[in-house]
Structure formats: C-alpha cells, structure tokens
A protein has these predicted regions:
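Catalytic phosphate/nucleotide-handling subdomain of diverse soluble enzymes
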Residues: 31-98
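Hydrophobic alpha-helical scaffolding
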Residues: 19-22, 47-51, 102, 106
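Generic long, charged, amphipathic alpha-helical segments
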Residues: 11-29, 35
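Conserved active-site and cofactor/substrate-binding residues in soluble primary-metabolism enzymes
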Residues: 24-28, 52, 56, 107-111
Length: 122
C-alpha cells in the first residue's frame, strides 16, 4: 500500500509541477530515481525513458492526479486524460469503444483453472 501511494504521489507531483501525465511504470522508475538521488547525493543527469502509455492505466493515473476520478467510467476517464494531457487517444484505445464484447464470463478465483480448461476444450 505504501508503494502504491509513492507511485500515486509521483504521478500527481509530476503532473502538478510539469503538466506531464506519466504512466504507472514510468512513475515507478521516477520514484526510484528520486529515492536514489536523495540517498546518494548523485547529481548526474539522468534520462528516464517512458515505455508505457498512461491510457493503458487511465484509472490509476487519473485517480493519482485527483481522487475525484476514482469512480469514473472508463471511457470518461480516457476522454479526461486526453483533455488534461493534450495527447491524442491511441487508435487501439479508441477502437475498443465500439468493439463487441467477445467474452463476458466472470468466475471466482477457485474456478479459474477449470474455466480455462473448458475454454481450451481440455
């Protein structure tokens, strides 16, 4: 839980200071780097390469920025992320708005193995 708060805090802090919306993976790297700097005093310039999209983690990213987004509808959060970041919604994310739901099976944890076997016809 403490790690999650650290990541949430990093996303919020960077957004508030720089207007940049970072994804959860990049927030981990950024938080680890900040901790490293604080512990070592190392001032070497560092580049953190973001390899994930905040759109993949829209709920986590948006609720880190402001708790008012915690219960938002997924596509509303994506639209708001686009608005605040100024970054176009990726085509793959946009396409799922109208995609047909192919699987809607919900199972309890203890039923997962058997359900997968049934899907595979085994």
């Amino acid at each position: 839980r403490q790690r999650q708060m650290c990541i949430r805090d990093r996303i919020k802090s960077v957004y508030e200071s720089d207007g940049y919306v970072m994804d959860t993976h990049t927030a981990v790297a950024s938080a680890v780097y900040e901790k490293y700097k604080a512990e070592t005093g190392d001032t070497t310039k560092t580049l953190i390469a973001s390899t994930a999209s905040p759109y993949k983690f829209a709920r986590s990213v948006m609720s880190a920025i402001d708790s008012k987004y915690e219960n938002g509808e997924d596509f509303a959060l994506i639209d708001e992320l686009c608005r605040i970041s100024g970054v176009k919604i990726p085509a793959a994310v946009e396409e799922i708005r109208s995609a047909a739901v192919l699987h809607n099976t919900v199972v309890d944890r203890d039923e997962m193995k058997q359900t997968v076997l049934e899907f595979l016809g085994l």
